């Protein structure tokens, strides 16, 4: 049996048949990061995304009170179609549920942001390995010392994901990922994690540590977990996001986002 399409993948998630990370799920379909917050903070967050397009490439904003992403997946329900969510109350992580039906309110607005899984498939097609996939782990993510451009209550550090490559592979990784600006685009830094304030690659803030192969160096991309780091600092009464690595599968094809 072939890989499930986007709608089938979401149905499996909704039924609880797929509860883990979504890397490799529904190949060829773009996946998205999710941030949900009250309408009173939506304009500030929209400005935050516009001011920080590398970590927060905006794909869609839903109508207030609607869990349906009409552009990316008109038959979906953002309350149930992500394998795992994170619920923050006043900056504290309070819950990681499999659905957010009990949490849903009529004033909530959903933001869907580009995800690096799209350019990861392009990296594989270009003959570049993905260490975290080979090692059966979620991609490692790190909070950096770079600050995002603030908007209202939203201010905080840039979060990056890391994939290791040999120095001669880096130009290819840069050129391939740069073709997907709506999915974080080209790397923000190559080598020297200490330049980003990262003290230990073996202790990521999100995801899992990966083993670097001989001669490999770390390559860092802006990451859609950045809004979670920002949510911790914003201290809003309620912010809901996807759990790292547990994305929303859209009906849009990866190829639609290549430039």
From Swiss-Prot:
Assigned keywords, A-Z: Lyase
Coiled-coil annotated residue ranges, if any: none
Family under the similarity heading: Belongs to the D-glutamate cyclase family.
NCBIfam families attached to this UniProt entry: PRK05463.1
Domain of life: Bacteria
Protein's name according to its UniProt entry: Putative hydro-lyase Rxyl_2409
InterPro entries, A to Z: D-Glu_cyclase (IPR009906), Putative_hydro-lyase (IPR038021), UPF0317 (IPR016938)
Region (Disordered): 1-24
């Amino acid at each position: 049996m072939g890989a499930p399409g986007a709608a089938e993948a979401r149905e499996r998630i909704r039924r609880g048949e797929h509860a883990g990370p979504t890397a490799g799920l529904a190949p060829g379909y773009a996946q998205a990061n999710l941030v949900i917050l009250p309408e009173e903070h939506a304009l500030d967050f929209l400005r935050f995304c516009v001011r920080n397009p590398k970590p927060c490439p905006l794909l869609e904003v839903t109508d207030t009170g609607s869990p349906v992403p009409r552009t990316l997946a008109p038959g979906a329900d953002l309350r149930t179609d992500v394998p795992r969510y994170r619920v923050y109350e006043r900056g504290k992580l309070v819950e990681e549920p499999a659905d957010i039906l009990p949490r849903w309110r009529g004033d909530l607005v959903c933001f869907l942001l580009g995800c690096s899984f799209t350019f990861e498939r392009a990296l594989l097609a270009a003959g570049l390995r993905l260490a975290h996939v080979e090692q059966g782990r979620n991609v490692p993510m790190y909070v950096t010392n770079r600050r995002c451009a603030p908007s209202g209550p939203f201010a905080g550090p840039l979060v990056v994901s890391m994939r290791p490559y040999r120095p001669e592979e880096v130009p290819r990784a840069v050129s391939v990922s740069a073709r997907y600006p709506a999915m974080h685009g080209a790397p923000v830094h190559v080598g020297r994690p200490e330049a980003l304030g990262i003290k230990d690659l073996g202790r990521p803030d999100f995801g899992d540590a990966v083993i670097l192969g001989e001669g490999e160096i770390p390559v860092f991309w802006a990451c859609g977990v950045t809004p979670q780091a920002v949510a911790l600092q914003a201290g809003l009464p309620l912010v809901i996001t996807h759990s790292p690595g547990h994305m929303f599968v859209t009906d849009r094809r990866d190829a639609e986002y290549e430039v």
